[in-house]
Curated annotation (Swiss-Prot):
It comes from Escherichia coli O157:H7. It is an enzyme of class 4 (lyase). Pathway: Amino-acid biosynthesis; L-isoleucine biosynthesis; L-isoleucine from 2-oxobutanoate: step 3/4; Amino-acid biosynthesis; L-valine biosynthesis; L-valine from pyruvate: step 3/4. The lineage of its organism: Bacteria, Pseudomonadati, Pseudomonadota, Gammaproteobacteria, Enterobacterales. The gene is ilvD. Binds 1 [2Fe-2S] cluster per subunit. This cluster acts as a Lewis acid cofactor. This is Dihydroxy-acid dehydratase. One of its GO terms (molecular function) is 2 iron, 2 sulfur cluster binding.
Length: 616
């Protein structure tokens, strides 16, 4: 029978000092012996996805204490990728994932907590907490802050839905008036919550459902809706049950590594492909799998991408649907239901509620359930009122979207595409693969060949795009922006957005060893591995080289002979200490970022730290 970890600090005469300190936090004799559960919050006023979380930890804590546990809350950092975008701040985004994972480990292990409730939401916070949860392998439940309502505004006598990306594109489009740009900017992000499309934050919060570590509705129920409060209340109660099951009944099925098994990871990736999720999810799932010691690789993702269709299309791939529409159609469980009926899921998995996949679908799939309360929950909709407050409205759609032929979520027979929303490409400068969000690629450019325009920083590429130096037919290559080369693997949302602003969204390709925002669409190929800074062949591309992209056949090829590439590699190596570094880039790199870069692996490994360099 496992012993409560917290007993290390609460039992025995030699722990008198620790107990004295616990008493100073409000604990009493009656609490010594109860499970201590960490409420891992991520409130910050910097991030709209987290600005409403200040009091939500208290909600969870009250339920933990009522159920017989002791709740102790702490906070992690949270970087807003949208605010950090387009300048040096983006260098810090991906490295913050490792800091979050480490800080959770530090706090939980230093104080011997028995279990966790993770209150996450945005881009690197959910992955960081997920990595920590699987590393620690103690009972955990995720409950995120929820999606933002879609922005809405009237343009050309028509009400259109908006998000952050629309503000970026219009702001850079010289054809858009100042007044229209200002109107879109003021309307794009109306409420608290994670940005309203299927961007990285919402993609990851959906995937926690598929992994079994969060409750149904977690990924899609709006941050502003009063129904979301119940997820927090349930999490507080349920974590005590899971904790006691493990420590008092020796039930290891309560542990996250047994819930988020390889089968669950495959289900999560299947969901991701079907819903056209952010390419960043690939990076984060690979990293989380390593923490769980699960053999889940780019090869597994490639195999799944070849057989899973696209059953859901959401912004930025279309303006028609946002997360509020996904929820109305049944949310994550609605998509999983269609995938299950198509025979594409592993059914022998359980979630934190103790339900198998068939049981979860029977109870929560709007196409199957007889539970009116569940149907009512999925009718939770937007209010259209600007707010930073959680649970501030109770509006509902009149009906569910259960149209699986023409609605937001489709059945297999009516799939948006027989090919899924993500694909892995391989070729002579992406030997370990690269990723493209096919959900956002126009059919006319699924095959594309063009001359390379090579840039060694995102900044130079942006200057060239806005300066008219990139023209239709070009393949923009941005290198030395990988985990090590950046360092920090910046998102390339501004270059892709500005290509659209210049009318080149369907006329150019962009390839990088960096990554893309979940808000990116277009022929945007990222995560090229190995990255340039690790000796990857992307570092050998020269201006004018022809690059052929073939998404249907999963290929990407630099049309340069092997002999020429070998000569270029020899010349690169001859640069000595300067080999595999950018030639003409001035960038101030802090010690913290240099420390990150010294251990960073390429994207095909999840951009995690190279344990072999530490003897691990």
């Amino acid at each position: 029978m496992p012993k409560y970890r917290s007993a290390t600090t609460t039992h025995g005469r030699n722990m008198a000092g620790a107990r004295a300190l616990w008493r100073a936090t409000g604990m009493t004799d009656a609490d010594f012996g109860k499970p201590i559960i960490a409420v891992v919050n991520s409130f910050t006023q910097f991030v709209p996805g987290h600005v409403h979380l200040r009091d939500l930890g208290k909600l969870v804590a009250e339920q933990i204490e009522a159920a017989g546990g002791v709740a102790k809350e702490f906070n992690t950092i949270a970087v807003d990728d949208g605010i950090a975008m387009g300048h040096g701040g983006m260098l810090y985004s991906l490295p913050s994932r490792e800091l979050i994972a480490d800080s959770v480990e530090y706090m939980v292990n230093a104080h011997c907590a028995d279990a966790m409730v993770c209150i996450s939401n945005c881009d690197k916070i959910t992955p960081g907490m997920l990595m920590a949860s699987l590393r620690l392998n103690i009972p955990v439940i995720f409950v995120s802050g929820g999606p933002m309502e879609a922005g809405k505004t009237k343009l050309s006598d028509q009400i259109i839905k908006l998000d952050l990306v629309d503000a970026m594109i219009q702001g850079a489009d010289p054809k858009v008036s100042d007044s229209q740009s200002d109107q879109v900017e003021r309307s794009a992000c109306p409420t608290c919550g994670s940005c309203s499309g299927m961007f990285t934050a919402n993609s990851m919060n959906c995937l926690t459902e598929a992994l079994g570590l969060s409750q149904p509705g977690n990924g899609s129920l709006l941050a502003t809706h009063s129904d979301r409060k119940q997820l927090f209340l349930n999490a507080g109660k349920r974590i005590v049950e899971l904790t006691k099951r493990y420590y008092e009944q020796n039930d290891e099925s309560a542990l996250p590594r047994n819930i988020a098994s390889k089968a669950a990871f495959e289900n999560a990736m299947t969901l991701d492909i079907a819903m056209g999720g952010s390419t960043n999810t690939v990076l984060h799932l690979l990293a989380a799998a390593q923490e769980a010691e699960i053999d889940f690789t780019m090869s597994d993702i490639d195999k799944l991408s070849r057989k899973v269709p696209q059953l859901c299309k959401v912004a930025p791939s279309t303006q028609k649907y946002h997360m509020e529409d996904v929820h109305r159609a049944g949310g994550v469980i609605g998509i999983l239901g269609e995938l299950d009926r198509a025979g594409l899921l592993n059914r022998d998995v359980k979630n934190v509620l103790g339900l198998t996949l068939p049981q979860t679908l029977e109870q929560y799939d709007v196409m199957l359930t007889q539970d009116d309360a569940v149907k009512n929950m999925f009718r939770a909709g937007p209010a259209g009122i600007r707010t930073t407050q959680a649970f501030s409205q109770d509006c509902r759609w009149d009906t569910l979207d259960d149209d699986r032929a023409n609605g937001c979520i489709r059945s297999l027979e009516h799939a948006y595409s027989k090919d899924g929303g993500l694909a892995v490409l391989y070729g002579n400068f992406a030997e370990n693969g690269c990723i493209v969000k096919t959900a956002g690629v126009d059919d006319s450019i699924l095959k594309f060949t063009g001359p390379a325009k090579v840039y060694e920083s995102q900044d130079d590429a942006v200057e060239a795009i806005l300066g008219g130096k990139v023209v239709a037919g070009d393949v923009v290559v941005i290198r030395y922006e990988g985990p090590k080369g950046g360092p920090g693997m910046q998102e390339m949302l501004y270059p892709t957005s500005f290509l659209k602003s210049m009318g080149l969204g369907k006329a150019c390709a962009l390839i990088t060893d960096g990554r893309f925002s979940g808000g990116t669409s277009g022929l945007s190929i990222g995560h090229v591995s190995p990255e340039a800074a690790s000796g990857g062949s992307i570092g050998l591309i020269e201006d004018g080289d022809l690059i052929a992209i073939d998404i249907p056949n999963r290929g990407i090829q630099l049309q340069v002979s092997d002999a020429e590439l070998a000569a270029r590699r020899e010349a690169q190596e001859a640069r000595g200490d300067k080999a595999w570094t950018p030639k003409n880039r001035e960038r101030q790199i802090s010690f913290a970022l240099r420390a990150y870069a010294s251990l960073a692996t390429s994207a095909d490994k999840g951009a995690v730290r190279d344990k072999s360099k530490l003897g691990g």
